[in-house]
């Protein structure tokens, strides 16, 4: 399943009312797909090929929790093992410097999503140093992301990860915005 606008290569920033500063991503929305289809998205960012190569590692499930460098600060992964949270606990987060490629190794992550253009309840200004902004708005969609599938969240995609009734094991690859 792909949820991406096909005209992103000819982005028209004048049409979009979103606040992100990277116009090429202003007309995208989150992507959900199986890892076997990942190469179809490599043209969206030159770091995606390295991100997907990392996610295809035979030893991915055995990697230790924490940061794993792939291409320095440009592409790196965080391996996460965490108990899932309830939907009421999560808050929308958005990033501007990095795109999240969230891959589920085990468990089912019921990630929430809402377009940034409809977020009206920022908790604070964007934190440039840590690359995040939190919103109190509630998601407009929930997406069940199962093992072997990934979700890509662009700067326009506030999202709530780690929503599950079970233990989750994930790889979150951070890909620098171009």
Model-identified regions with their sequence ranges:
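Short, Lys/Arg-enriched N-terminal segments with co-localized hydrophobic residues
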Residues: 6-29
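A short, N-terminal "cap"/entry segment at the start of jelly-roll beta-barrel domains
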Residues: 25-79, 89-94
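A short beta-loop-beta micro-motif enriched in histidine and acidic residues
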Residues: 72, 88-100, 118-122, 138-139
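Conserved short histidine dyad/triad with adjacent acidic residue
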Residues: 78-95, 105-119
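Short, conserved beta-strand element in jelly-roll/cupin
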Residues: 97-109, 115-117, 125-131, 174
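A short hydrophobic beta-strand segment most commonly corresponding to one strand
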Residues: 101, 150-152, 166-178
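Conserved metal-binding segment of the jelly-roll/cupin
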Residues: 143-158
């Amino acid at each position: 399943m792909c949820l991406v606008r096909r005209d992103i290569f000819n982005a028209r920033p004048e049409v979009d009312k979103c606040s992100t500063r990277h116009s090429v991503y202003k007309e995208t929305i989150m992507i959900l797909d199986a890892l076997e289809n990942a190469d179809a998205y490599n043209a969206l960012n030159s770091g995606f090929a390295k991100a997907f190569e990392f996610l295809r590692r035979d030893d991915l499930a055995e990697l230790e929790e924490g940061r794993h460098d792939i291409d320095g600060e440009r592409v790196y992964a965080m391996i996460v093992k965490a108990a899932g949270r309830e939907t009421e606990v999560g808050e929308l987060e958005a990033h501007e410097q990095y795109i999240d490629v969230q891959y589920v190794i085990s468990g089912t992550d019921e990630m929430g999503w809402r377009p940034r253009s409809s977020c009206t309840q920022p908790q604070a200004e964007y934190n440039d140093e840590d690359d995040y902004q939190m919103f109190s708005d509630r998601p407009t969609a929930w997406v069940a992301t199962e093992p072997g599938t990934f979700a890509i969240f662009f700067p326009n995609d506030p999202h709530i990860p780690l929503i599950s009734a079970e233990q989750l094991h994930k790889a979150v690859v951070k890909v620098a915005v171009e």
